[in-house]
Amino acid sequence: INRDIFSNVKFTFVRQKTQNGLGDAIAHSEHLIQEEAFAIILADDLIINNPSCISQLMKIHEENECSVIGVNEVPENETEKYGVISIDEPSSTNNSYVLKDIVEKPQSNAPSNLAVVGRYVLSSKIFKYLKNLEPSVGGEVQLTDAIKLMLNDEKVIGYLYEGTKFDCGSRHGYVNAIKHLAKEILDD
């Protein structure tokens, strides 16, 4: 590992004592975030691109001064695996969609085929919505539910990022990611 990359980086770990969902895990970090926007990167989604997916989302966040969620297009028969966004129309920025609604793992009639991936740049205002949430899907506090509440008060953009995504939460996706990265290394 190139240690120079991490020379100016500080890592802080916050432990979630019980697994009560992504929303609950994020709520535990409020004391570190305070009033700043922050990024969330879920490790089971590997996204390869330059600029990185988070860099793309941060650019949209800075241009629009609102929360931004990474999305990608999925086949209609796979929408029940993801949070899916509902939109009115694309915004003036290419690949950007102003969210009308967000639905966690819709079982039928998904509002679109734009699925949320594990990349977010969120306003610290999200903590206000996380505080009063009750467990929902899977008996967990869902980040999706907090974002849905946030939509009542402010704009949230779904950004169709550029890059290749691998679902490393499945064995098949993980193996495909390793094969892709190995091929890149061997081709260099």
Which residues does each PLM region occupy?
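Conserved beta-loop-beta/alpha segment of the NTase-like Rossmann-fold superfamily
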Residues: 1-87, 122, 131-133
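Catalytic-core segments of class I nucleotidyltransferases/pyrophosphorylases
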Residues: 39, 58-59, 91-166, 171-188
